[in-house]
């Protein structure tokens, strides 16, 4: 059932014909030029990319106070395109809310490790807010602030509700009461998974066993779910080096951890189930809803094609190709183009170390997963073993990731605010029940944390076994609200998240069983595959 997802708005900022206020000039007085496809070749001769000098003295008293720059007495204004050009670690800028920050000298000091390089050249408001549940590091950030963004536009609303701040406070308090650290707690599980992974690899390669190839697929999926996923979110350990090593688990499977980080951390987590229109110079798109398009239609704002009416039938065979496609094709396309959809991947893939990691891991996996089995057992048998291993891994991973967002219980959004967002009778009933218990003002529907609750669905919430078998993805709501918290802690904070959601009138959606969640996904695919119903304004042919 389709209903209008109303009451959305976007905060527009006046640009006054593109000129800064109070007579201030753009950086170096240069007219900003658009960045073409994220290329960096123009930087050497681009006068608009000379790094401004930071003012001396202590940081401002408050987060939004102005900095005195070059004696002008006002902050400099920068455009989004100017920020985009500073995307490499040797010259890296980022934005948070309306502030522009030159973090080049801070990258090596960042307590969270190298994850900050993912945000270079782009808006990091969501990353900074969601990865610092104990509070935004304003004092540190102000040391690197160089100006204000002249043209900030975003779908999301910030600071208009206490929902997310209160949720953070109460979730962290619950962890403290339970004596659980925010990160870590996965060492024993990781050891068991890696042991099974390497033993099963040896068995299927050395003894041409299809059974062990399937076991490797299961173990490999858990390297992805339980090790690299937490590692690349900075949640596997309190040690940043250990997190980085855990994040390379994706490379261990045969896919690229770098490409995955851009798609998952930068794309999916920031813009969950969101499709952008032309309002934004940097589109706010969730790449996951386009991951199988046009073969499959997952978002109501993507165009329908006749073969989509059968997508609920061929979805599961297609899901099984997830890791094979990443190992053999899609990762290479991203590395060569430096783009994942609308996401510029230059900050990690241009530097030499990024190239060495990508190509080195790909070569090693090609030799160990394809060449060696083919050499030992013949080409046909070697490729068959490789296929079985990755079909099992791909199916397991795809289902675990997809059923939490592509579901009849999830919202699907568009930055134009005119799309019809899908709500089922179950979701409406849950919303009405939550409204009856509401004790606090309902946040605006485009509050970022609210959209995460609306676009995610849990299954078997609170279940410890389900939590470990899914790498915490059965607690999808908790994961999206607190990506830097270890999935081992999700059963602990889930009751708090549910309680706060109900207090603010937000439906906390949870399927009782895994099978219910799978059925919710299939039902959504059926609805997205049905031919669109003509409206009154449509002309009859």
From Swiss-Prot:
- Check the record and name the InterPro entries matching this protein: Cyt_B5-like_heme/steroid-bd, Cyt_B5-like_heme/steroid_sf, Cyt_B5_heme-BS, FA_desaturase_dom, Fatty_acid_desaturase
Renumbered to this chain, motif Histidine box-1 spans 229-233
Protein's membrane topology: Multi-pass membrane protein
User: Is-annotated flag, keyword rRNA-binding?
Assistant: no
CC cofactor: Fe(2+)
Motif Histidine box-2 in this chain: 264-269
Provide the reaction this enzyme catalyses: a (7Z,10Z,13Z,16Z,19Z)-docosapentaenoyl-containing glycerolipid + 2 Fe(II)-[cytochrome b5] + O2 + 2 H(+) = a (4Z,7Z,10Z,13Z,16Z,19Z)-docosahexaenoyl-containing glycerolipid + 2 Fe(III)-[cytochrome b5] + 2 H2O; a (7Z,10Z,13Z,16Z)-docosatetraenoyl-containing glycerolipid + 2 Fe(II)-[cytochrome b5] + O2 + 2 H(+) = a (4Z,7Z,10Z,13Z,16Z)-docosapentaenoyl-containing glycerolipid + 2 Fe(III)-[cytochrome b5] + 2 H2O
A single GO cellular-component term on record = membrane
Listed A to Z, the keywords are:
Electron transport, Fatty acid biosynthesis, Fatty acid metabolism, Heme, Iron, Lipid biosynthesis, Lipid metabolism, Membrane, Metal-binding, Oxidoreductase, Transmembrane, Transmembrane helix, Transport
Region of interest (Disordered), residue spans? 15-60
Span of domain Cytochrome b5 heme-binding: 75-150
Query: Which EC number(s) does UniProt give?
Result: 1.14.19.31
Using the UniProt record, give the first listed, main subcellular location.
membrane
Sequence motif: Histidine box-3, positions: 476-480
What this protein is called in its record is Acyl-lipid (7-3)-desaturase
What organism is this sequence from?
A: Euglena gracilis
């Amino acid at each position: 059932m389709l209903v209008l997802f109303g009451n959305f708005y976007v905060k527009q900022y006046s640009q006054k014909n593109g000129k800064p206020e109070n007579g201030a000039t753009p950086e170096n007085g240069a007219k900003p030029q658009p960045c073409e496809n994220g290329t960096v070749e123009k930087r050497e001769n681009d006068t608009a990319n000379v790094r401004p000098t930071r003012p001396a003295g202590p940081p401002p008293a408050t987060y939004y106070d102005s900095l005195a720059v070059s004696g002008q007495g006002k902050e400099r204004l920068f455009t989004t395109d100017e920020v985009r050009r500073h995307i490499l670690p040797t010259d890296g800028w980022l934005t948070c809310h309306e502030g522009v920050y030159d973090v080049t000298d801070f990258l090596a000091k960042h307590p969270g490790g190298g994850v900050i390089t993912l945000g270079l050249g782009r808006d990091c408001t969501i990353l900074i807010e969601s990865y610092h549940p104990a509070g935004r590091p304003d004092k540190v950030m102000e040391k690197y602030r160089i100006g204000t963004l002249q043209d900030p536009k975003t779908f999301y609303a910030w600071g208009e509700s206490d929902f997310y701040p209160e949720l953070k406070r109460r979730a962290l308090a619950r962890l403290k009461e339970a004596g659980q650290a925010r990160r870590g707690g996965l060492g024993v599980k990781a050891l068991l998974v890696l042991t099974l992974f390497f033993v099963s690899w040896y068995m299927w390669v050395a003894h041409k066993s299809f059974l062990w190839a399937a076991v490797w697929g299961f173990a490999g999926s858990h390297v992805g779910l339980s090790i690299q996923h937490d590692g690349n979110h900075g949640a596997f350990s309190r040690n940043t080096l250990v997190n980085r090593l855990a994040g390379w688990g994706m490379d261990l499977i045969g896919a690229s951890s770098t490409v995955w980080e851009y798609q998952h951390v930068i794309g999916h987590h920031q813009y969950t189930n969101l499709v952008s229109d032309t309002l934004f110079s940097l589109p706010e798109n969730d790449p996951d809803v386009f991951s199988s398009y046009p073969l499959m239609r997952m978002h109501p704002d993507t165009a329908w094609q006749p073969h989509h009416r059968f997508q609920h039938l061929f979805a599961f065979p297609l899901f099984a190709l997830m890791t094979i496609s990443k190992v053999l094709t899609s990762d290479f396309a991203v590395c060569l183009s430096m783009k994942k959809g609308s996401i510029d991947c230059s900050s990690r893939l241009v530097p030499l170390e990024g190239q060495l990691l990508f190509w080195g891991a790909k070569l090693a996996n090609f030799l160990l997963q394809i060449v060696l089995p083919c050499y030992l057992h013949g080409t046909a048998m070697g490729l068959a073993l490789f296929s079985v291993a990755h079909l099992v891994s791909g199916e397991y991973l795809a289902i675990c990731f997809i059923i939490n967002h592509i579901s009849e219980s999830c919202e699907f959004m568009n930055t134009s605010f005119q799309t019809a967002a899908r709500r089922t009778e179950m979701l409406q009933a849950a919303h009405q029940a939550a409204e009856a218990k509401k004790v606090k003002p309902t946040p605006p529907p485009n509050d970022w944390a609210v959209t995460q609750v609306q676009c995610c669905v849990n299954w078997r919430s609170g279940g410890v076994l389900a939590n470990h078998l899914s790498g915490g993805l059965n607690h999808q709501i908790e994961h999206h609200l607190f990506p830097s918290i270890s999935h081992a802690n999700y059963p602990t904070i889930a009751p708090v998240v549910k309680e706060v959601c109900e207090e603010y009138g937000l439906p906390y959606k949870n399927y009782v069983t895994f099978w219910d969640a799978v059925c919710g996904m299939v039902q959504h695919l059926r609805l997205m595959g049905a031919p669109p119903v003509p409206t009154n304004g449509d002309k009859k042919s």
